[in-house]
């Protein structure tokens, strides 16, 4: 059979890795796909010194690839929202299958893109958009298809995980570790997407849609970053038997779905609590299988290329099949997607870590306990430290049982109004993941 002809748009880290893997493992890939996969054209603004593209035609215009009649599959690896969106729609319009690693594109424009792809009978594959080299999308969409997924939780941004790991292991401050992450290339010059949870929210949006069979709704995901975390809270969490991770959590409830990204205390004996550095991990809990864990490199040249090429193999296998018999993009048929709402954060339920800076006066603890009790908030554990020499304040650390967030909001407002409490109350959510 003739090889399938692929056009790669973007020859940066992932694009270069994809080209190299396709070239190096060409024979093995052909054996798996049933026919060869040939890179027939590349769109790139500049060469990649880590790639020997040889005689492969190169253009500076990505739309040359989308409009090339010889190309069967367009691989979109340019990133961003605008140009990538236009490129993918043009490729679909021209009847080409698409493989992308662009989580922002899928999270924000995926509903539109998948609808256009169905109209044209083409495939859009996006395994590499979440957690790099970990095939977690395929695991949820296909491997766990017998299950009603109850919840999933993931460390899905390597930059944030590197920062929190360094803060815990070496006692370093957030600004100090962020500067190193930027120097090492883990974080961008503008690290907002990584440290404020936007990148993780893109990925969580995709995972939740596949797990629960709901439309992509990135705009309804609650997002909270790690830039305000202090070494003190990392250390207190450690003393209580927890690790702080920047976690994406999606949960099915009777009222709707929770979709939230935020710093989270996890018991230190959980496997996911011990995922350190730039590595990623995703836990998925299904009613039949129980809890499963998927771990690996969440980024990088060839780990991400591994998922891109795996998608290419799947596309080659499925491109001649009847579109009605293909695995749906979001695991469920479009007319079977749930319309249950995404819950606002105030309606979500969690346990909470609260750090209160109390004045060294008698009766403050009793006042705190009364405020929590009046709002139906039960305390699981409490830790009081010695008064700090600098300002005479006593750090009071509480861990509550699970409760609706609105009650915690009300309690924090009342606590901060107490004369015996100084400054804002620190609140970090707690998940047992069992």
Swiss-Prot record:
Class in the EC hierarchy, top level: oxidoreductase
Record's cofactor remark: A sodium ion is seen in the structure; a metal ion may subtly affect the relative position of the nucleotide-binding region to influence enzyme activity, and could increase the stability of the enzyme.
Binding site for NADP(+): 14, 45-46, 103, 185, 188, 300
Signal sequence extent: none
Binding-site list for NADPH: 13-14, 45, 103, 300
Catalytic activity: L-homoserine + NADP(+) = L-aspartate 4-semialdehyde + NADPH + H(+); L-homoserine + NAD(+) = L-aspartate 4-semialdehyde + NADH + H(+)
E.C. number: 1.1.1.3
GO biological process: methionine biosynthetic process; threonine biosynthetic process
Gene Ontology terms for molecular function: homoserine dehydrogenase activity; metal ion binding; NAD+ binding; NADP binding
Domain ACT positions: 353-429
Function field: Catalyzes the conversion of L-aspartate-beta-semialdehyde (L-Asa) to L-homoserine (L-Hse), the third step in the biosynthesis of threonine and methionine from aspartate.
Protein name: Homoserine dehydrogenase
Organism ancestry: Bacteria, Pseudomonadati, Pseudomonadota, Gammaproteobacteria, Pseudomonadales
């Amino acid at each position: 059979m003739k090889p399938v002809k692929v056009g790669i748009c973007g020859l940066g880290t992932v694009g270069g890795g994809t080209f190299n893997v396709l070239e190096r493992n060409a024979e093995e890939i052909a054996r798996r796909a049933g026919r060869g996969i040939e890179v027939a054209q590349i769109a790139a603004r500049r060469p990649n010194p880590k790639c020997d593209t040889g005689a492969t035609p190169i253009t500076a215009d990505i739309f040359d690839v989308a409009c090339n009649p010889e190309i069967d599959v367009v691989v979109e690896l340019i990133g961003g929202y605008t140009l990538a969106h236009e490129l993918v729609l043009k490729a679909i319009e021209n009847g080409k299958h698409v493989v992308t690693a662009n989580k922002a594109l899928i999270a924000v424009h995926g509903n539109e893109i998948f609808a256009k792809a169905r109209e044209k009978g083409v495939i859009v594959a996006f395994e590499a958009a979440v957690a790099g080299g970990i095939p977690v999308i395929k695991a949820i969409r296909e491997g766990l298809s017998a299950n009603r997924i109850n919840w999933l939780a993931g460390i899905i941004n390597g930059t944030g995980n590197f920062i929190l790991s360094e803060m815990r292991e070496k006692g370093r401050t957030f600004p100090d570790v962020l500067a190193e992450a930027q120097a090492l290339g883990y974080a961008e010059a503008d690290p907002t997407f990584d440290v404020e949870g936007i990148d993780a929210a893109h990925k969580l949006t995709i995972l939740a849609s596949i797990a629960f069979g709901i439309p992509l709704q990135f705009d309804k995901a609650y997002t909270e970053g790690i830039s305000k975390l202090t070494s003190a809270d990392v250390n207190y969490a450690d003393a209580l038997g927890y690790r702080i991770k920047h976690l994406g959590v999606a949960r099915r409830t009777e009222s709707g779905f929770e979709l939230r990204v935020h710093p989270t205390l996890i018991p230190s004996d959980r496997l996911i609590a011990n995922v350190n550095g730039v590595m990623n991990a995703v836990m998925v809990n299904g009613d039949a299988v129980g809890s499963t864990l998927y771990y690996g490199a969440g980024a990088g040249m060839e780990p991400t290329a591994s998922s891109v090429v795996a998608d290419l193999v799947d596309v080659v296998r499925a491109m001649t099949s009847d579109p009605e018999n293909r695995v749906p993009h979001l695991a469920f048929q479009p007319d079977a997607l749930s319309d249950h709402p995404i819950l606002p954060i105030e309606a979500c339920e969690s346990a909470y870590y609260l750090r209160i800076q109390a004045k060294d006066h008698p009766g403050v603890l009793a006042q705190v306990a009364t405020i929590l009790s009046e709002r139906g908030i039960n305390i699981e554990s409490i830790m009081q430290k010695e008064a700090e020499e600098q300002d005479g304040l006593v750090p009071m650390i509480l861990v509550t049982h699970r409760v609706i967030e609105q009650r915690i909001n009300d309690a924090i407002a009342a606590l901060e109004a107490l004369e015996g409490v100084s400054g804002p109350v620190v609140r970090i959510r707690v998940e047992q993941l069992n």
